[in-house]
Amino acid sequence: MKPAVDEMFPEGAGPYVDLDEAGGSSGLLMDLAANEKAVHSDFFNDFEDLFDDDDIQ
């Protein structure tokens, strides 16, 4: 027996909707821009080049 949606997500569906209901991809992009997250000011960005294959041994 598969759990019902309200059993899996008791807090509700949240901001997630079908693309058909959101008005297509443009509505989805607007939702993404409205829900943009900010990086903490103390975030230490020392990742160098993650896609640099020259240093693979």
Swiss-Prot record:
Coiled-coil regions listed in the entry: none
GO annotation, cellular component aspect: chromatin; COP9 signalosome; cytoplasm; nucleoplasm; nucleus
A Pfam family of this chain: MYEOV2
GO biological process terms on file: cellular response to UV; positive regulation of cell population proliferation
Keyword Transmembrane helix assigned: no
The keyword Glycoprotein is assigned to this record: no
UniProt-listed InterPro entries: CSN9_metazoa
Keyword annotations from UniProtKB, A to Z: Cytoplasm, Nucleus, Signalosome
Compartment(s) where it occurs, according to its Swiss-Prot or TrEMBL record: Nucleus; Cytoplasm; Nucleus, Nucleoplasm
First-listed, main subcellular location of the protein, grouped into a coarse class: nucleus
Family named by the database record: Belongs to the CSN9 family.
Function description: Component of the COP9 signalosome complex (CSN), a complex involved in various cellular and developmental processes. The CSN complex is an essential regulator of the ubiquitin (Ubl) conjugation pathway by mediating the deneddylation of the cullin subunits of SCF-type E3 ligase complexes, leading to decrease the Ubl ligase activity. May play a role in cell proliferation.
Subunit structure, as described in the record: Component of the CSN complex, probably composed of cops1, cops2, cops3, cops4, cops5, cops6, cops7, cops8 and cops9.
Protein name from the UniProt record: COP9 signalosome complex subunit 9
